[in-house]
């Protein structure tokens, strides 16, 4: 009899929870419509995978790409709408969050065609790969719109779990296993530190979890200048630092870049930084409003260390992927300048614009690494010598992306850095901008060194890998080269017409 009553109570409680969830989704689902499209795409992928054979592989790519493009379209249709807080305060929809979601979706859309040939050549499981990519994209989008501490913790964990699985996707590769283990351990440690910081914020604000309510709670409890807030600030900075990978929280980055499948590295190198930057701007700017001087100082230290260490160590690297790992550490130092400048002096607008250019520059470079690696099986920088003699398109497109990463005019990277540094200079960050300018010159050196190798025509310098290099027979049907072409165009042409892009970015400020 007791068991029967308990069973009835359990059924009633479950029904209430289900009805509440259905009610929330019914009345708030339109606010996360782009995310719902991705969820539908995930379900469709699983259904097709369970009912079809490997001959239907093209459908998997089509469904994934279509889901991402439809999600981008839904975001664009929602542009300029009034900011809305939904799901009982868990999510906030505004232009600032949506443009970061757009950047994540754009990166994922470009990464799928970049991965097609790699998956076919390495015989990786296609369905799981695409599921992890879409789920990680979903986690990044939820993180961009997160408005409370619980969602800010759960969303990046969704992204991180998929990242761990993707980085260890080539299970027979010892380097991949080592990178995944290191990534998992450091990711778990950083998540623990992040939660520790959240607990201090929660307690100091009197039990509030929404970002704006935390500020009100700190005012009511008079705890906004307490030691607990300082502990929370340091802990959260460390936790977010792992996602952004600035120095000295960069230890996992070179190993994961080198050991993971190259399309996975291309995906993680941008999406993780975009999502973490969106979260960092809101966490630092809202709950830590009264500690702006303290977090500005912390981020300035991280930016200086990242720009100096990242670019100096990149010079010494012999692996192309490790070089890009340290280059990305330097690049995040430039992005942090925009976070520090903030809403004033168009800091956020310049940061968003530079991130848009960084996606195209970085993915274009990784597309070249994927293409060259599949045909030669090497990642060593020296083995690229003389590539221009065998594949002029690949060599020239690589050179343009590298020059744009270095910030040479008139490419997009130059104008992106110029506006970012100018905003920092107007905000009085003279020392930080000076370090950025000097380290940009250093980065040009190692990018030009690679370009010199690509363009060399002397037979004695051409490596056996390039001598035996075979070009793709169907260039128009090569998805890697399609991705690379899009990235090269985006790395060059937008730099000439910056004002419309900056104007759109300025409209995203909250």
UniProtKB/Swiss-Prot annotation:
Localisation: Plastid, Chloroplast thylakoid membrane
Reaction equations catalysed: a plastoquinone + NADH + (n+1) H(+)(in) = a plastoquinol + NAD(+) + n H(+)(out); a plastoquinone + NADPH + (n+1) H(+)(in) = a plastoquinol + NADP(+) + n H(+)(out)
PANTHER family: NADH DEHYDROGENASE
Name of the protein in question: NAD(P)H-quinone oxidoreductase subunit 2, chloroplastic
Gene Ontology BP terms: ATP synthesis coupled electron transport; photosynthesis, light reaction
GO annotation, cellular component aspect: chloroplast thylakoid membrane
Tree of life domain: Eukaryota
Gene: ndhB
Function statement: NDH shuttles electrons from NAD(P)H:plastoquinone, via FMN and iron-sulfur (Fe-S) centers, to quinones in the photosynthetic chain and possibly in a chloroplast respiratory chain. The immediate electron acceptor for the enzyme in this species is believed to be plastoquinone. Couples the redox reaction to proton translocation, and thus conserves the redox energy in a proton gradient.
